[in-house]
C-alpha cells in the first residue's frame, strides 16, 4: 500500500521555503524545540484567529516571528494590546528580543490548514461530515481552486468501526512538483472520540523563470554571416 509524502516537505527548495530560517551548530536541538514551543503557544492562544503557519527567523539575539492569519484583528487586539502582550510573553520564553509581523490571508478558502480547522469546528458542532465536506469543497472551488481533496477519518456519525471517507473535486496532482499543492491537518474532538481531517488544495502551478539557453557557436556564426 502506497503512503503519501507530505506535499509541503516534498516541494521545499523547488517552489516552497522553510518555515524556520536560521543556522545553528551545537544549539540546533534546543532551538528546534524552542520553535515548536513558540508555534504551539501562538496556535493555542489564538486558535480562533485562523492561523495557517508561523515563520521564525533568527539572527543573533533577535527573533522575527511572522504569523499568517485569516483574522489579524484577533491577534492585534484593540489598540495593539494583544500583540504587545504576545511579544512580551515570547520574549520571556526565549530570553531574546522578539519582533512580531502579522500577514493577513486574503483568501482563507484557499488555505488548506484553515479549511481543515473549519471542517473540524463544524464536526464539533455536530454538523454532518458529508455536508461539511461538500460545503467546504464548493467554497474552495468557487474561490478559484483548481482542485481539492478532503479525507475524514474516525468514528464517523458515531459508528462502532472507524473508517475513512473521501470527497474530491477538480485536479490534485501530488507528484507534479510545480503544482502549488497546499496541505492541512486538523483534529475534531467529538463525543465519540477524535476525528482527523486532511485537506489537499491545488492552487495552480508555479513556473520557474524561463532561462535563456546560451547560443551554440554555429548558430552565432550563421547570425553574424546573415548580417
Swiss-Prot record:
Domain of life: Bacteria
SUPFAM superfamilies (alphabetical): Prokaryotic type KH domain (KH-domain type II) (SSF54814), Ribosomal protein S3 C-terminal domain (SSF54821)
KH type-2 domain residues: 38-106
Disulfide feature: none
Pfam families: KH_2, Ribosomal_S3_C
Alphabetical GO biological process terms: translation
Any one Gene Ontology cellular component term annotated for this protein: cytosolic small ribosomal subunit
Keyword line: Ribonucleoprotein, Ribosomal protein, RNA-binding, rRNA-binding
Transmembrane segments: none
Claim: Translocase is one of the keywords in the record: no
Gene3D superfamilies: 3.30.300.20, Ribosomal protein S3, C-terminal domain
GO molecular function, one term: mRNA binding
Subunit structure: Part of the 30S ribosomal subunit. Forms a tight complex with proteins S10 and S14.
Family per record: Belongs to the universal ribosomal protein uS3 family.
Function description: Binds the lower part of the 30S subunit head. Binds mRNA in the 70S ribosome, positioning it for translation.
Protein name as annotated: Small ribosomal subunit protein uS3
Encoding gene per record: rpsC
Amino acid at each position: 500500500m502506497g503512503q503519501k509524502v507530505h506535499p509541503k516537505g516534498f516541494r521545499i527548495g523547488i517552489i516552497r521555503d522553510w518555515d524556520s530560517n536560521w543556522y545553528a551548530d551545537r544549539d540546533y536541538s534546543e532551538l528546534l524545540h524552542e520553535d515548536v514551543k513558540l508555534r504551539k503557544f501562538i496556535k493555542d492562544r489564538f486558535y480562533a484567529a485562523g492561523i495557517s503557519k508561523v515563520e521564525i527567523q533568527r539572527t543573533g539575539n533577535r527573533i522575527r516571528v511572522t504569523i499568517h492569519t485569516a483574522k489579524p484583528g484577533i491577534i492585534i487586539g484593540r489598540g495593539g494590546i494583544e500583540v504587545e502582550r504576545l511579544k512580551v510573553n515570547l520574549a520571556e520564553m526565549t530570553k531574546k528580543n522578539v519582533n512580531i509581523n502579522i500577514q493577513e490571508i486574503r483568501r482563507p478558502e484557499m488555505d488548506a490548514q484553515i479549511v481543515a480547522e473549519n471542517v473540524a469546528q463544524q464536526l464539533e458542532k455536530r454538523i454532518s461530515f458529508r455536508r461539511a465536506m461538500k460545503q467546504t469543497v464548493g467554497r474552495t472551488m468557487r474561490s478559484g481552486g483548481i482542485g481539492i481533496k478532503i479525507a475524514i477519518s474516525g468514528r464517523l456519525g458515531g459508528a462502532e468501526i472507524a473508517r475513512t471517507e473521501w470527497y474530491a473535486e477538480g485536479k490534485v496532482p501530488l507528484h507534479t512538483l510545480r503544482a502549488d499543492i497546499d496541505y492541512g491537518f486538523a483534529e475534531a474532538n467529538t463525543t465519540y472520540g477524535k476525528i482527523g481531517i486532511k485537506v489537499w488544495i491545488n492552487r495552480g502551478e508555479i513556473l520557474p523563470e524561463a532561462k535563456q539557453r546560451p547560443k551554440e557557436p554555429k548558430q552565432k556564426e550563421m547570425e553574424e554571416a546573415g548580417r
